[in-house]
From Swiss-Prot:
It holds the Pfam family PNP_phzG_C. The lineage of its organism: Bacteria, Pseudomonadati, Pseudomonadota, Gammaproteobacteria, Enterobacterales. Homodimer. It is an enzyme of class 1 (oxidoreductase). InterPro entries: Pyridox_Oxase, Pyridox_Oxase_CS, Pyridox_Oxase_N, Pyridoxamine_oxidase_dimer_C, Split_barrel_FMN-bd. The gene is pdxH. This is Pyridoxine/pyridoxamine 5'-phosphate oxidase. Coiled coil: none annotated. It comes from Serratia proteamaculans (strain 568). Keywords: Flavoprotein, FMN, Oxidoreductase, Pyridoxine biosynthesis. FMN binds at residues 66-71, 81-82, 87-88, 110, 145-146, 190, 200. One of its GO terms (molecular function) is FMN binding. The keyword Glycosyltransferase does not apply. Pathway: Cofactor metabolism; pyridoxal 5'-phosphate salvage; pyridoxal 5'-phosphate from pyridoxamine 5'-phosphate: step 1/1; Cofactor metabolism; pyridoxal 5'-phosphate salvage; pyridoxal 5'-phosphate from pyridoxine 5'-phosphate: step 1/1.
Length: 217
């Protein structure tokens, strides 16, 4: 228990000076602006620019978050892959509502997608799984994600065992490994601004079009 914490986080602050976001900077389709920002994040050599915070909820309404890598995006949605026995996959099976947050701190930016997740087809999953490095494929077999284990050595021993087993030939797709596509209907773009007057624009699906509103910071 920390009673007298000398590490005071209340005074940790900085100014956001990397520019603003104006309506004439926006695109008609939010995915076009997202792609532009993502490319800028890559050009800025941010660590893991495709990393997103994935939020789901359990049957009691308790939210959970974790970092997952985006693997594809287009007008159909945003795609990520995971162990189907994982907490997030189980929660999405019960409640498909999901939030994705891209935290590009070094650029004073963030993007939030809201929508529903749907399972990818076996063909889509197999196609991506085949493109992964072999060690990553084996890693998918090793971990029963979110289950309790006694020590890291359990994972390492299993990895070496399976690496020997799959030394020759291809690594098959685990039946418990798959992916999700997030069909989004809301996207918010946030750009840090001076004096905490941040710029926020919310895209909301309106039939085949997108309604755009500026939000107060």
């Amino acid at each position: 228990m920390i009673e007298n914490n000398e590490f005071d986080v209340a005074d940790l602050r900085r100014e956001y000076t990397r520019g603003g976001l104006r309506r004439n900077d926006l695109t008609t389709n939010p995915l076009e602006l997202f792609e532009h920002w993502l490319k800028q994040a890559c050009d800025a050599r941010l660590a893991d620019p495709t990393a997103m915070c994935v939020a789901t909820v359990d049957e009691n309404g308790q939210p959970y978050q974790r970092i997952v890598l985006l693997k594809h995006f287009d007008d159909k949605g945003l795609v990520f892959y995971t162990n189907l026995g994982s907490r997030k996959a189980q929660q999405l099976a019960n409640n498909p509502h999901i939030s994705l947050l891209f935290p590009w701190h070094m650029l004073d930016r963030q993007v939030i997608f809201l929508g529903k997740a749907e399972r990818l087809s076996t063909f889509e999953v197999m196609k991506y799984f085949a493109s992964r490095p072999k060690d990553s494929q084996i890693g998918a077999w090793v971990s029963q994600q979110s289950s309790r284990i006694s020590a890291r050595g359990v994972l390492e021993s299993k990895f070496l065992e399976l690496k020997q087993k799959f030394q020759q030939g291809e690594v098959p797709l685990p039946s418990f490994w798959g992916g999700f596509r997030v069909n989004f209907d809301s996207v918010e773009f946030w750009q840090g601004g001076a004096n905490r007057l941040h710029d926020r624009f919310l895209y909301q699906r309106d039939g085949n079009d997108w309604k755009i509103d500026r939000l107060a910071p």
